[in-house]
Swiss-Prot record:
GO terms for cellular component: photosystem II oxygen evolving complex; plasma membrane-derived thylakoid membrane; plasma membrane-derived thylakoid photosystem II. InterPro entries: OMP/PagP_b-brl, PsbO. Keywords: Manganese, Membrane, Photosynthesis, Photosystem II, Signal, Thylakoid. It comes from Synechocystis sp. (strain ATCC 27184 / PCC 6803 / Kazusa). Its main location: membrane. Disruption phenotype: No photoautotrophic growth, no oxygen evolution. Decreased growth rate at 30 degrees Celsius with 25 umol photons/m(2)/s, no growth in Ca(2+) depleted medium, decreased growth in Cl(-) depleted medium; further decreased in a double psbO-psbQ mutant. No dimeric PSII forms, PsbQ does not associate with PSII. PANTHER family: OXYGEN-EVOLVING ENHANCER PROTEIN 1-2, CHLOROPLASTIC. GO terms for molecular function: oxygen evolving activity. This is Photosystem II extrinsic protein O. Belongs to the PsbO family. It is found in: Cellular thylakoid membrane. PSII is composed of 1 copy each of membrane proteins PsbA, PsbB, PsbC, PsbD, PsbE, PsbF, PsbH, PsbI, PsbJ, PsbK, PsbL, PsbM, PsbT, PsbX, PsbY, PsbZ, Psb30/Ycf12, peripheral proteins PsbO, CyanoQ (PsbQ), PsbU, PsbV and a large number of cofactors. It forms dimeric complexes. Contacts PsbQ. Pfam families: MSP.
Amino acid sequence: MRFRPSIVALLSVCFGLLTFLYSGSAFAVDKSQLTYDDIVNTGLANVCPEISSFTRGTIEVEPNTKYFVSDFCMEPQEYFVKEEPVNKRQKAEYVKGKVLTRQTTSLEQIRGSIAVGADGTLTFKEKDGIDFQPITVLLPGGEEVPFFFTVKNFTGTTEPGFTSINSSTDFVGDFNVPSYRGAGFLDPKARGLYTGYDNAVALPSAADKFRTNKKETPLGKGTLSLQVTQVDGSTGEIAGIFESEQPSDTDLGAKEPLDVKVRGIFYGRVDTDV
């Protein structure tokens, strides 16, 4: 019993250290200063960087000039799926879901560009990077909804009249959503798009089974809103919140997609050089 105060003190230090690491501070997410052993199995690899202090600075931009975005990162924090109501008189509503995917949900190392139009319109175009993650969400009723979280080929614009990137800058636009499964994927009955059986074994191809037998990899469309809330003009860092809406997985065209809404935070760096 005499060791109880020491144990309590040790636990307090441990919990304090964990709180510090996950507090979202700049040190906690500065992966360049951490080793592999510091990051592995901690969840830090799934955390986007943050601007060290709250700031509402500006990054001046000039018309007919292109700026480059690097280290762009998007960290999802909330997931919603639109469910059809039981009562036909009610409207379909988004229901909050619980993410089942562990520590591999963020998009990072994304590159892009921001072009400034003559009227002050800013256009953000995504180029490449780790810009997709397969995620599964659990709904309150027990249904699991897989979807391909991505911002591929995102092109977002602002309202005209901007002479700088500031905390009032909002990029809104569309992006492509590739199929959750590839063309070479085989379902449990060995059916695929370009390989495998044309229809289920020992089951004739009937009209009601046509959609399940005929595999497709449809390209969907999504919308994304990036709301800049923090800008550090000295370092070119920007950060803010995002809201994305996109279709869910269709099981290679076998079922109708559900509408998925994702909310979270983002971070990036803006520079005049590549």
